[in-house]
Amino acid sequence: MKIAHLTSAHPRYDTRIFIKMCHSLAKHGYDVSLIVADGLGNEIKNNVAIFDVGAKTGGRLSRMTKTVKRVLDAALKLNADIYHLHDPELIPIGLKLKKLGKKVIFDAHEDLPKQILGKPYLNKPTKVVLSKAFTLYEHWACPKFDAIIGATAFIRDKFLKINANTVDVNNFPLLDELANTSDWSKKLNEVAYVGDISKIRGIEEVILAMNYTHGVKLNLAGKFGDKALENKVKNQQAWLKVNELGFLNRQQVNEVLAKSKAGLVTFLPAPNHIDAQPNKMFEYMSAGLPIVTSNFPLWREIVEGNQCGFCVNPLNSNEIGDAIQYIVEHPQEAEEMGKNGRKSVEEKYNWLIEEQKLLMLYKGLSA
């Protein structure tokens, strides 16, 4: 059975697409290819054949036209049995492949209509119109696909209303990847923020929160998406308490988490954040770190239900800083919260469980 995963927007070694899904399918005997658009060339890695259609050029419009056309051409050459799409802009490709008699899965990583409502570069009327338009487009296109995968149960439930063959495959961590046995007493008075750095993810409030801590450093790993925002936060007095690490590979992230005492996920209350399940939340838990997260109902259920951290108002830097300081000053309690988080990952929030859902879906489509 020949499988082709398609992305026009994600990096070739994307954690969900390549490290988890492609690797799991290849491990279980599928002939797996991955089409990407990064200009880094073709290769075979972990028994997955990676085909590069060339780097993305221009802005969003160029990516959604020229790059998508190149992805379609590469997909047709592969002549796969099942095509697995990872970007909304690839939906037209899926419809064309369906007309050719191919089986198509659309993987909804995000609730895009809600995500559009949180775009800072769009004015409110434009957000509302685009969000409603894409909702109508989803309702028209997605019932035509053989299956839909939602990255969360919330996204699954949304698509179940229009496509009965919808499952959730959560982006939970690989059990062994971030596990560490470092002695808590040897950890530094440092906390970690790992991931994309943006206003909507609360970076301004996190930096200002360091003003309310004493003897604590912030390990900041990731890239700024906006130069003006980067300049703004770097001009804050609190920036003196930041270890700027830039983009890190998975092993480097593991090393940072091993020496940190907490992980921060304090996204601002944008429409697509409220019901989201940030990967980093579960990765921090997998690494045995207590977490400081936004106090959204779903996040509160996860954090407080598993006694693995604190939920705070993400708009209140003082509250974020107080939670960080408490964790640093109460090592026994912090270590216990970290163990609780790790235990919950071992029991329910891990890729082994999600892998079985993925394999069952593919087994059904292969029959």
Language-model features, listed with the residues they occupy:
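A short, well-ordered alpha-helix in the C-terminal region of glycosyltransferases
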Residues: 319, 326, 333-348, 357-360
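Donor nucleotide-sugar binding/catalytic pocket of nucleotide-sugar-dependent glycosyltransferases
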Residues: 36, 51, 128-180
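Conserved donor-binding/catalytic core segment of Leloir-type glycosyltransferases
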Residues: 4, 149, 183-211, 218-219
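Nucleotide-sugar-dependent
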Residues: 11-15, 201, 251-256, 261-285, ...
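Nucleotide-activated donor-binding/catalytic signature segment of Leloir-type glycosyltransferases, i.e.
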Residues: 230-255
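Conserved acidic donor-binding segment of nucleotide-sugar-dependent glycosyltransferases
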Residues: 305-306, 310-317, 326-332
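Membrane-proximal helix-turn-helix segments that form the acceptor-binding/catalytic region
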Residues: 23, 69-76, 96-100, 106, ...
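Glycosyltransferase donor-sugar binding loop
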Residues: 39-40, 217-231, 246-247
